[in-house]
Amino acid sequence: MSNEVETSATNGQPDQQAAPKAPSKKEKKKGPEKTDEYLLARFKGDGVKYKAKLIGIDDVPDARGDKMSQDSMMKLKGMAAAGRSQGQHKQRIWVNISLSGIKIIDEKTGVIEHEHPVNKISFIARDVTDNRAFGYVCGGEGQHQFFAIKTGQQAEPLVVDLKDLFQVIYNVKKKEEEKKKIEEASKAVENGSEALMILDDQTNKLKSGVDQMDLFGDMSTPPDLNSPTESKDILLVDLNSEIDTNQNSLRENPFLTNGITSCSLPRPTPQASFLPENAFSANLNFFPTPNPDPFRDDPFTQPDQSTPSSFDSLKSPDQKKENSSSSSTPLSNGPLNGDVDYFGQQFDQISNRTGKQEAQAGPWPFSSSQTQPAVRTQNGVSEREQNGFSVKSSPNPFVGSPPKGLSIQNGVKQDLESSVQSSPHDSIAIIPPPQSTKPGRGRRTAKSSANDLLASDIFAPPVSEPSGQASPTGQPTALQPNPLDLFKTSAPAPVGPLVGLGGVTVTLPQAGPWNTASLVFNQSPSMAPGAMMGGQPSGFSQPVIFGTSPAVSGWNQPSPFAASTPPPVPVVWGPSASVAPNAWSTTSPLGNPFQSNIFPAPAVSTQPPSMHSSLLVTPPQPPPRAGPPKDISSDAFTALDPLGDKEIKDVKEMFKDFQLRQPPAVPARKGEQTSSGTLSAFASYFNSKVGIPQENADHDDFDANQLLNKINEPPKPAPRQVSLPVTKSTDNAFENPFFKDSFGSSQASVASSQPVSSEMYRDPFGNPFA
C-alpha cells in the first residue's frame, strides 16, 4: 500500500505507464488517445464502472498515510475473514468513477451506498501484497473513513482511472484560472483588487497542486500563510524580555541603598525617554533604538570603570570629572553598580516630578521646605528629586537634624541618607506607586531597608537622640506619609515638638474631630508623639485621645499631662487641640523611644492610666475604625514599667492577673476590633455579672471578683449609650479601681465598669505579674 499512484505532470506519462501493464481492452483502445477532452468525455455522465466487492469501512484519524491505510486494510480483511467463516459474504458493488467523484452502488439493488466527491477524497493506496485490493480515504476534517475495496480483476486500471480523473480535473481548473487571469488583466484594476485576486489564484493553484502531487490531497487545508503571526510573537517575546530586564534592575537596586548609597556618585541628567512627557512614547515602541550598552541593567555585574557607560553620553564634562573623582571614593558596603543605581534614581526623579502634588497633600500641615534648606548635590540635581517623595513629607518635631551649614561627606546632606534608609516608610504612605515608564514596575526601592528598620539617621552624627527613635516598630508603618521626615526638624537640640517647629500651633477644626478618611490624623494635631510612631494608630489610641479634645473643652486638667517640661502651648484639652509634647509618653508601644532628651522617665509613673481613661469616657464618641490590633499599648506599659503603680496595687490586681489567663487568644483578638457598642454592652454586663466568663476557672476567682466588685461598685449609673472606643481598653491596662475614686463619683462610676472588660482584651500579651 506504500505505492501511491504517481502523478503525471504531462499527458504523455499515462501512456508510458499503461504500456507495461496487463492491459485491458479499454486501455488498449483508448490509452494512446488520453487527452483532456478524451478524459472529460470518458468521465462525464455516469463515468466508468468497475465490478468489485466492499471489504469494509474503517474510521481513521488522518487524511492520508501509508501505515494508517495498511493497518485499516489488515483490520478489515481480518473482519471479512471472520465473517466468511460464519457464512457471510462481502457485499458486491459497482465502483463508478466520474467527474462527480466515486460512487459505490449495490450490485443487486442498484442503490447508491456511498458517494464521495473528488474534493472529499484525500488519499488512495494500493495493496502491494494483493493486486486486486486497494483503498481510499475520504471524508471531511475529523471524519475520515477508509474504504477497502477488492476488485473483480486487477486493481491497477481502477487506480489509473482515478489518477486520470484527478489529473483532468486539475487541468480543467488550471485552464479556467488562466483564462480568468487574462480576463482580469484586461480589465481596469481598482483599489488594488488585482493583487488580492492574484493571491487567491495562487492559493487555488497551490491547493490544486498539492492535491495533484499527493493524489487526493486535503483541499481544506490552506497553504502556510502564518509567517506574520510568528513574527508578531517574536516581537512580543522581545518586548517582554526587555521589560523583565528593566524590572530586574529595579528589583536589585534597593539592595544598593544600604545606609551609604551610591548617592556620592553623580546622577546624570535623565534620558529623554525616561521623562514623564516621553514616558509612553519611546518606551512603548516595538522597535526601540539600539542601546550602546545592552548590559547596563544587569544587577549582578560590576560596572567597568574603564569603559564608559551608556549614560556617559548624557553627562557634561564636569559631571564626568565628578564621576571619576567620586567613583574612587571607597564605599562601606562594597562595590555598587552605579549604572543600575542611576537607572533607579532616574525613575525616582520621574516619580518625584509626577507625584509631587500628591506628596504635598500629606496630612502634616508643614512642608519640609520650611524647615530644611534645598540641598544641591554634586551633579546639580536637587536632593528632593533624588530622594523621591521623602523630602516632601512633613517634618516630625521629635527628631533633630543637623544645622543648615553642616557639610556631610560626598556633598549629600544627612536626610538624604536617612531618607533612603527609611524608604519603607515613605513608599507605603499616602502616595500610591507612581505611574512607571515600564509596565509592571512599582517603586521597588521603597522596600529596600527591611533590614534597616532601626537604621534611620544611624549615619547622621548630629542627631541628638538614640537611633531607636528612628524606627520605633519592627514593622513598616502602613499609614504615615514618610515618617522619615516626620523625625526631623531644623533644631539641633532636643526641644518640645511645637517649640521645634517654631512655636506654630496646630488648630483642629472644632466641628469635625473625627474625619474617618485617615486612620492616623486627618489634619489633626500632628505633633503628638503617637503620630510620630508611624502608622499604628491603634497602638496609641490616637483617634480617641486627640480627636475628642475639641468636644472636651470643659476638661481643662493639664496637670496630669504636664509631668515634665511643659512648653508654652495652649491647654492640653482646650479647643485648640494642641497637645503637650509629653502628653502620651507612657502610651508608646516600644519601650518609650521618646524617653531620652525629650520625655523624662518619671512621666511614666507620675500619671496613672486611669486618669486618661476617665477623661476619655464621658464625651460621646463615634465608633472607632477597624485597624491593626489595638492591644499593643498594654504591652508597651508592661515593657516600660512592669512594676508601675505598685504603691496602689491591691487584691483586685492580683486576682485580675489570674483572670487574664483564661480567655483564649483568638477570641480576644477578634474582640478588640468589635464596635464600641459591643464594648459598652460588655461593660454593663460585667458591671453586674463579674466572673461569668471565668466559669471554667476556679471558683475562688469567681468569688474574689464578686467580692471585689461589690467593694468597688459605686452607685450604678444607667448603661452608657455613649460609644466607648475600643482603644479605651488598652488604656485601662493598669487601672486601679480604688485609685480612680479620687477623681469623683462620676468619673469613678464610669471607669469602674471597665476593668473586667479591659482585662478581657489584655490576654494575648500575657501577664507580667504571673
UniProtKB/Swiss-Prot annotation:
Its main location: cytoplasm. Residues 663-671 are annotated as: Required for interaction with GRB2 and CSK. The modification Phosphotyrosine is found at Y170. Residues 649-770 are annotated as: Required for interaction with MYO6. The modification N-acetylserine is found at S2. InterPro entries: DAB1/2_SBM, Dab_PTB, PH-like_dom_sf, PTB/PI_dom. Residues 230-447 are annotated as: Required for localization to clathrin-coated pits. One of its GO terms (cellular component) is lysosomal membrane. Disulfide bonds: none annotated. Residues 709-725 are annotated as: Sufficient for interaction with SH3KBP1 SH3 domain. Phosphorylated. Phosphorylation during mitosis is leading to membrane displacement. Keywords: Acetylation, Apoptosis, Coated pit, Cytoplasm, Cytoplasmic vesicle, Developmental protein, Differentiation, Endocytosis, Membrane, Phosphoprotein, Protein transport, Transport, Tumor suppressor, Wnt signaling pathway. Residues 1-16, 302-313, 366-396, 407-425, 466-480, 604-616 have a biased composition (Polar residues). Residues 745-758 have a biased composition (Low complexity). The keyword Cytoplasm applies. Interacts (via NPXY motif) with DAB2 (via PID domain). Can interact (via PID domain) with LDLR, APP, APLP1 and APLP2, and weakly with INPP5D (via NPXY motifs); the interaction is impaired by tyrosine phosphorylation of the respective NPXY motifs. Can weakly interact (via PID domain) with LRP1 (via NPXY motif); the interaction is enhanced by tyrosine phosphorylation of the NPXY motif. Interacts with LRP2 (via NPXY motif); the interaction is not affected by tyrosine phosphorylation of the NPXY motif. Interacts with clathrin; in vitro can assemble clathrin triskelia into polyhedral coats. Adapter protein that functions as a clathrin-associated sorting protein (CLASP) required for clathrin-mediated endocytosis of selected cargo proteins. Can bind and assemble clathrin, and binds simultaneously to phosphatidylinositol 4,5-bisphosphate (PtdIns(4,5)P2) and cargos containing non-phosphorylated NPXY internalization motifs, such as the LDL receptor, to recruit them to clathrin-coated pits. Can function in clathrin-mediated endocytosis independently of the AP-2 complex. PANTHER family: DISABLED HOMOLOG 2 (PTHR47695:SF5), PID DOMAIN-CONTAINING PROTEIN (PTHR47695). The PID domain binds to predominantly non-phosphorylated NPXY internalization motifs present in members of the LDLR and APP family; it also mediates simultaneous binding to phosphatidylinositol 4,5-bisphosphate. The Asn-Pro-Phe (NPF) motifs, which are found in proteins involved in the endocytic pathway, mediate the interaction with the EH domain of EPS15, EPS15R and ITSN1. This is Disabled homolog 2. It comes from Homo sapiens. The lineage of its organism: Eukaryota, Metazoa, Chordata, Craniata, Vertebrata.
